[in-house]
């Protein structure tokens, strides 16, 4: 974390058990939008804020005393505290959902994925999901060899990662809101790392997943002011890390193996990218 990373932030107390807000940051993802919704198992007793930035402009809204129990604060260096009455119940369950689209999207994600579920239920669901992914492979070898294999297999399933809300909405490379229709949108394409092995591997073991990744890459090109497939895309941003044209290998391999069928769409994206002097 460094000074100036947060471009703008917001926190709202919607009611005594729901917080929403967002943070726009500048970093490897040049303009990264992160919205959140936080549900609380106990009502807030009282709360307060502090803006650590010295603001020269004193607008009319500064006549309000926002340091305590004011329902909203914005700024670049804001911090907050919340007090709860835990005399009768010492347990406080905090559920957090994220969205790159909006606070409303974060609330939808929260309701869809965590509503009515305990921490133990969510943890068990995560274990079940991971086991269902990893149990497709059964190998022989020493414990160290198995640990190495399954750790590497686990790594292939972390990134690229899903980048959309439960309703299919996502923030595109043009920073507009789009709807993924008929595919799952992905981000985090470190293609100079993954074109050699991960994407060819996914074509063999998870072809549907890699087809969605290819479609996500093509949508990236269609939303690009340069008309380019990803170089190294991250959270709706192109960070331009590494030279070379690695995306073409990913698309060509998926087409050759029959994983991706929209050849005309893919070819148009590949030709467009190849004509950009990068």
Features from the language model and the residues they span:
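Helix-terminus loop motifs that line ligand-binding clefts
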Residues: 170-174, 178-179, 209-259, 263, ...
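Secondary-structure capping and boundary motifs in well-ordered enzyme cores
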Residues: 144-145, 184-193, 239-247
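Short acidic (Asp/Glu) and glycine-rich catalytic loops that position anionic groups and cofactors
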Residues: 106, 129-133, 193-194, 228-230, ...
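Inter-helical turn/loop segments and adjacent helix faces that build the functional surface
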Residues: 134-141, 204, 258-263
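Short, hydrophobic/aromatic alpha-helical segments in well-folded domains
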Residues: 20-27, 196, 200-201, 213-216, ...
């Amino acid at each position: 974390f460094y000074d100036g990373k947060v471009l703008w932030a917001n926190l709202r107390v919607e009611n005594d058990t729901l917080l929403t807000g967002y943070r726009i940051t500048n970093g490897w993802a040049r303009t990264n939008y992160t919205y959140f919704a936080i549900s609380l198992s106990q009502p807030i007793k009282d709360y307060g804020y502090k803006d650590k930035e010295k603001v020269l402009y004193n607008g009319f809204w500064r006549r309000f005393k926002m340091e305590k129990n004011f329902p909203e604060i914005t700024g670049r260096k804001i911090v907050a505290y919340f007090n709860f009455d835990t005399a009768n119940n010492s347990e406080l369950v905090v559920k957090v959902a994220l969205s790159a689209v909006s606070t409303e999207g974060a609330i939808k994600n929260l309701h869809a994925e965590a509503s009515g579920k305990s921490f133990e239920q969510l943890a068990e669901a995560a274990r079940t999901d991971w086991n269902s992914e990893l149990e497709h492979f059964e190998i022989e070898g020493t414990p160290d060899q198995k640990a190495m294999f399954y750790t590497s297999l686990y790594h292939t399933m972390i990134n690229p990662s899903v980048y959309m809300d439960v309703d299919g909405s996502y923030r595109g490379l043009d920073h507009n809101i789009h709807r993924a229709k008929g595919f799952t949108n992905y981000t985090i394409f470190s293609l100079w790392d993954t074109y050699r092995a991960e994407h060819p591997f996914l074509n063999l073991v998870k072809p549907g997943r890699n087809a969605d990744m290819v479609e996500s890459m093509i949508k990236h090109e269609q939303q690009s002011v340069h008309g380019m497939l990803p170089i190294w895309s991250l959270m709706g941003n192109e960070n331009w890390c590494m030279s070379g044209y690695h995306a073409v290998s990913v698309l060509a391999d998926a087409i050759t193996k029959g994983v991706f069928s929209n050849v005309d769409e893919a070819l148009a994206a590949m030709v467009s990218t190849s004509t950009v002097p990068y």
